[in-house]
Design a protein with these regions (language model features):
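P-loop NTPase motor domains
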Residues: 58, 66-363, 378, 399, ...
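Conserved ATP-driven motor cores of ASCE-family P-loop NTPases powering translocation/secretion/packaging/pilus
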Residues: 355-409
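Basic- and hydrophobic-enriched, low-structure N-terminal and domain-boundary segments
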Residues: 1-83, 87-90, 135
Length: 409
């Protein structure tokens, strides 16, 4: 009997202190995923998927497995020139016709190839912003999407981010002073001008009417008189407060600020651009309500007018996020897929924050780049944050070092 008890204690002790070994897995268990791994993310209805490869796709609906629902639909696409980013990713996803689309279209070839299919087969409304041939563009008026002082600040931020020199140093003062003047003028137009004058043509006319004289501190330009009149009526008016801050500079400095501001807005002063921005046809607020395909045709050679698409994207996200919360209590009824081909062509301010929150509003973004270094060059330290907000990365090939490191880690 004693031998039996001793044997039992020996077996019990060994089991209690036994180490768990996974034989054959001494160097890790990482492996390539297979059909069973991707299956929970795929919708049985092929048309309700986001396409990645011939065998991999993601459902636009809710993932069946609750433990896997932390996956978002943001995609980072990396591929060198000629790797098929447009042919094998942008176009196939457009032809799924399962969402509203916002598609950047360098050279304007994508809308030519899929536009009629979207209209006839998907019953889409087509919207086109053409910054290569303004006469072929629909009208876009940023003033149409201003509803508050915050919107005014956001509009000025995107203008400054895409029209000012990227050099550092003494530029900060001039940028801040230029921003104050733009905020004051835009606020005055938004709150005080009649509806037909709420556009960039009026902003340019007011800027051209601004004047200061170095030897005469008491000189009043027509714009000064407008703000003086408004200050007497509403001293706490947002436009008055911003203009007062701008006017605190000395005469010579004011003149330099006016020159800086005029230089920043010079691309708007072309008659074709003035005409295109006279009124609005884009209906950005409806992208999440019904099926609309918006194509932004931008030059991949001359970046002069790329700020127009950046301005539109920035306002679109603000409008859609507000509408999702205020009208639909969280999520838009129609998914909005943003296909940003050649994403480095323009800069969207605060993008590192926007890309992290749009998922909850039923919006997704496909950030398409030739190299990862393009993202780092544009967004600096925020590049990793932006990449981290994309649950999926699609690599189509390339030799650039930062892209290869991104894929291998």
């Amino acid at each position: 009997m004693c031998c039996g008890v001793l044997l039992w204690l020996t077996v019990y002790y060994r089991k209690k202190n036994a180490k768990k070994f996974r034989h054959g897995a001494e160097y890790g268990t990482a492996r390539w995923g297979g059909p069973k791994d991707i299956a929970p993310f795929i919708n049985a209805d092929f048309s309700q998927n986001l396409l990645l490869t011939d065998t991999e796709r993601l459902t636009l609906g809710q993932i069946a497995d609750p433990e896997k629902r932390n996956v978002n639909l943001n995609v980072l696409v990396l591929g060198g020139s000629g790797s098929g980013k447009t042919r094998y990713h942008i176009k196939p996803n457009l032809l799924q016709m399962n969402a509203s689309y916002v598609c950047s279209d360098p050279k304007g070839t994508v809308v030519e190839e899929v536009g009629q299919v979207l209209i006839k087969k998907g019953h889409y409304k087509l919207k086109i912003l053409n910054t290569i041939d303004f006469s072929a563009s629909m009208h876009y008026n940023p003033f149409h999407y201003l509803h508050s002082e915050t919107d005014i600040l956001s509009l000025v931020t995107v203008i400054m981010a895409n029209t000012q020199s990227k050099e550092k140093g003494g530029d900060d003062f001039w940028q801040q002073a230029t921003a104050l003047l733009l905020q004051a003028l835009i606020a005055y137009i938004y709150y005080e001008a009649p509806e037909e004058e709420k556009n960039f043509a009026m902003l340019l006319d007011m800027l051209n009417a601004c004047e200061c004289r170095e030897g005469d501190e008491n000189f009043k330009s027509p714009v000064d008189l407008l703000f003086d009149k408004l200050a007497k009526r509403e001293p706490d008016h947002f436009a008055v407060k911003q203009y007062t801050k701008f006017r605190q500079a000395a005469g010579k400095t004011l003149k330099s600020i006016l020159i800086s501001c005029s230089a920043a807005l010079a691309p708007f002063d072309i008659q074709e651009v003035r005409d295109m921005m006279a009124y609005d046809e884009m209906e950005l607020e409806k992208l999440g309500d019904e099926k609309i395909a918006l194509f932004c045709i931008v030059s991949d050679v001359d970046p002069t007018f790329n700020f127009l698409s950046a301005m539109l994207y920035s306002q679109m996200f603000n409008v859609l996020c507000d509408r999702a919360l205020k009208v639909y209590h969280g999520r838009l009824p129609v998914h909005v897929t943003c296909l940003f081909d050649e994403f480095a062509n323009q800069k969207i301010p605060n993008w590192e924050h926007l890309v992290s929150v749009i998922r909850s509003r039923n919006i997704s973004a496909h950030i398409v780049l030739q190299t990862y270094s393009q993202l780092k060059g544009m967004y600096k330290d925020n590049a990793e944050t932006i990449a981290g907000c994309c649950s999926t990365m699609l690599f189509l090939g390339g030799k650039e070092e930062s892209s290869l490191k991104m894929v291998s880690t």
